[in-house]
Each structure stands twice: as C-alpha cells, then as structure tokens.
C-alpha cells in the first residue's frame, strides 16, 4: 500500500497545473464506474452533479470526480472530462445514449487576471485534458493538481490522500 486513494483497486488519479494562473485540476477516474459519497457544506459551495453521490441517489456510481481550482470557472473542467469519457464510450446507459457521470467541486484560487482562456478554450478544460491523460495509480501530493493554488489567508494549502484497509464483518440478524 502507498497510502493513496489509488490503493483502492480501479481508482486512478491525474493532475495538471497552470503556473501562470496558480491553479490546477485533479481527476479521479478508472476503467469502470465507482461508488463515492459526498457531504457538501458551506453557503457557497461550487459543485456539479454532487446529488448523484448522495446515499439516497438511485444511480449510486460515477465515472469520474473532478476537483479544480478556478471557482465557478473551474467547473468547466468537468465538461471536458465528460467529453473525454464519452469519446471512450463510457457513461450511464439510457436507451441508445451514454451519459458520463462526472461529479465535481471547486475551490477559489483566482489571482489577478480575467483572461482564463486560450484560443477561446478555458484553461480548466485544457488542464482537465492534461490531467485525464495523466491518469495513474501514482500521483504527487502537496501543491499539485487542484491543490496547486489552494491557500488560506496566510497558509499555503495543497492536496493530500490516504487509504486504510478495514476488515469487513459478516453480521447475521436473527
């Protein structure tokens, strides 16, 4: 075990950063859909498709989770991941359609710039594309991916990961 989320079989992580804008993207995905859960807190949480991660959701799985800087602009990263998954034929099957299920959350890491586009493509789409191509069972912690521009008022943040094995119990109810 590497004490990373990728210790869970089938989970891969990809990261990409843009040093010019002090922002980044982290993607969790894999060859198959996986089960995840969410607890959204705060009054201004920037999220997309987190409802499908709630325990009462009828779907119960996702094709990817995208964590991004960029505040609301960063939600664009999940659209790129959804496009890439669709190109691979992945997604929730509805009749003749596939709908890749991508949940995402963003942090505020914007610096002094209002030009977050290259050739009319948002930098978060570009970063998502790079991160998706970097999917691996090994990734760096700290100021990488979505954690690249993370900070509080006075303390630099980053991304972390951990894993733990829990022995499953068999319960019999009589």
Specify the residue positions occupied by each region the protein language model found.
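Glycine-rich oxoanion-binding loops at beta->alpha junctions
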Residues: 39-59
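A generic local secondary-structure boundary/capping motif
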Residues: 2-3, 12-17, 53-56, 90-92, ...
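General beta-strand structural signal in soluble alpha/beta enzymes
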Residues: 4-7, 15, 38-40, 94-95, ...
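N-terminal amphipathic/basic leader segments beginning at the initiator methionine
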Residues: 1-40
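Conserved small/polar residues in nucleotide/adenosyl-binding loops
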Residues: 172-174
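A generic, well-ordered mixed alpha/beta core segment in the N-terminal half of proteins
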Residues: 63-64, 70-143
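Intrinsically disordered, low-complexity linker/loop segments enriched in Gly/Pro
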Residues: 136-158
């Amino acid at each position: 075990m590497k004490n990373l989320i990728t210790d869970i079989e089938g989970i891969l992580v990809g990261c990409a950063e843009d040093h010019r804008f002090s922002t980044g993207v982290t993607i969790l995905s894999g060859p198959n859909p996986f089960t995840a859960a969410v607890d959204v807190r705060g009054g201004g949480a920037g999220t997309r498709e987190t409802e499908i991660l709630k325990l009462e959701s009828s779907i119960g799985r996702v094709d990817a989770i995208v964590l991004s800087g960029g505040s609301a602009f960063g939600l664009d990263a999940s659209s790129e991941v959804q496009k890439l998954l669709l190109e691979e034929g992945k997604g929730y099957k509805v009749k003749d359609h596939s709908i890749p299920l991508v949940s995402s959350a963003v942090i505020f890491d914007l610096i002094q710039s209002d030009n977050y586009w290259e050739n009319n493509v948002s930098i978060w789409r570009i970063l998502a594309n790079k991160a998706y191509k970097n999917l691996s069972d090994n990734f760096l912690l700290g100021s990488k991916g979505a954690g690249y521009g993370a900070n509080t008022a006075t303390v630099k943040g980053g991304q972390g990961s951990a894993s733990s094995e829990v022995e499953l119990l068999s319960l019999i109810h009589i």
